[in-house]
Structures are given as C-alpha cells and as structure tokens.
Amino acid sequence: MACCVARCCSVPTGPATTICSSDKSCRCGVCLPSTCPHEISLLQPTCCDPCPPPCCQPEVYVPTCWLLNSCHPTPGLSGINLTTYVQPGCESPCEPCC
C-alpha cells in the first residue's frame, strides 16, 4: 500500500482547507498550507495522510505568505473579535503588598 499519498491536511470545520502547494512536493507526514492568496485561518488542521507516524501536530496557525509577498493584499481581520477586560480597582498604579 502506497504510504505517501499526495494529501496534506484538511480542516474539519469551516471553509478553510489546506492543500499541497503546487511548487512543493508533498512528503508523507508533512502538511503544507495552501498557496496565496488565502484568508487567515485560526482553525486546527487535522492530517488526513494515512501513513505512520502521525502526519502533523495540530496547532493554531496563521499563514504567513501574505506577509512576505506584497503582491497579495493582506487578509481582513474583521472576523477576529478581540475583547479586553479590566479588573475593577486597577486604575491606580500598582502598590506592593505583603
């Protein structure tokens, strides 16, 4: 049975999916991001390559190719909600306590 099938990673939920880059060869157990341009994905990819050892360690990732190539516009960050919370009583400068 062929181990190194030309498959990389697939995101189980959401529209984003990582595929093999056209300019790179997919080795067994290696996950490659899709080629530019693409949206920022904060989903955890799940490896679909059947060969041992486990292909990729799932981790939150942000594709960085748009940072290196000015030909593509930077993806919008409108979908990422950032909320900060300040504990009450912390407006004054910090004071050491015993």
From Swiss-Prot:
Region called 4 X 5 AA repeats of C-C-X(3), residue ranges: 3-59
Entry-annotated residues carrying N-acetylalanine: 2
Keyword Protease on entry: no
GO MF: structural molecule activity
Keywords, sorted A to Z: Acetylation, Keratin, Repeat
Gene Ontology CC entries for this record: cytosol; keratin filament
Sequence ranges of the Sequence repeats: 3-7, 8-12, 47-51, 55-59
Function: In the hair cortex, hair keratin intermediate filaments are embedded in an interfilamentous matrix, consisting of hair keratin-associated proteins (KRTAP), which are essential for the formation of a rigid and resistant hair shaft through their extensive disulfide bond cross-linking with abundant cysteine residues of hair keratins. The matrix proteins include the high-sulfur and high-glycine-tyrosine keratins.
Family, as annotated: Belongs to the KRTAP type 3 family.
Subunit architecture: Interacts with hair keratins.
PANTHER family, per the entry: KERATIN ASSOCIATED PROTEIN 3-3-RELATED, KERATIN-ASSOCIATED PROTEIN 3-1
UniProt protein name: Keratin-associated protein 3-1
Gene source species: Mus musculus
Gene responsible for this protein: Krtap3-1
